[in-house]
């Protein structure tokens, strides 16, 4: 029995050693960012991927999202927890299934941590804002009101 426990522990340790972090060292200067339209949020929003592949499971993803002035990302959820840091501009972070766009706009440097599957929304005031979003892939967004989903709209 002791041998069985020993070998079980040994296999578990070997498995965890093989599953060690595969993230590579990376330095991404701001002028190296490649901004692209982000089809997952309303028209005008852009994204730049700094690290990782948001389509891959288990991968650490760091991305910046550029939000125009007077902009709303309607209430939505993600299948993952996310950590958002406001880089520039001012934004409001709201919780719930209905947006009211009320409350004080956060200042650069503010951190917003949101658990998986918690409805939230983001809005800007009269200036553009950039947020940095970190999560473990794969990425995903589900709008509370399907009519708000820009991927389902035809222009």
Annotate each PLM feature:
Residues 14-16:
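N-terminal signal peptide c-region/cleavage motif recognized by signal peptidases
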């Amino acid at each position: 029995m002791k041998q069985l426990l020993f070998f079980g522990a040994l296999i578990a340790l070997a498995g965890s050693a093989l599953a060690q972090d595969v993230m590579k060292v990376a330095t991404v200067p701001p002028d190296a960012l490649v901004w692209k339209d982000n089809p997952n949020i309303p028209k005008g929003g852009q994204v730049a991927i700094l690290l990782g592949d948001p389509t891959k499971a288990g991968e650490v993803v760091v991305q910046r999202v550029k939000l125009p002035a007077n902009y709303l990302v309607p209430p939505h959820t993600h299948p993952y927890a996310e950590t958002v840091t406001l880089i520039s501009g001012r934004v409001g972070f709201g919780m719930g299934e209905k947006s009211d766009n009320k409350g004080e706009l956060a200042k650069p440097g503010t951190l917003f941590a949101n658990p998986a599957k918690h409805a939230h929304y983001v809005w800007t005031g009269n200036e553009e804002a950039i947020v940095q979003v970190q999560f473990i892939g794969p990425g995903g967004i589900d709008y509370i009101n399907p009519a708000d989903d820009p991927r389902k709209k035809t222009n």
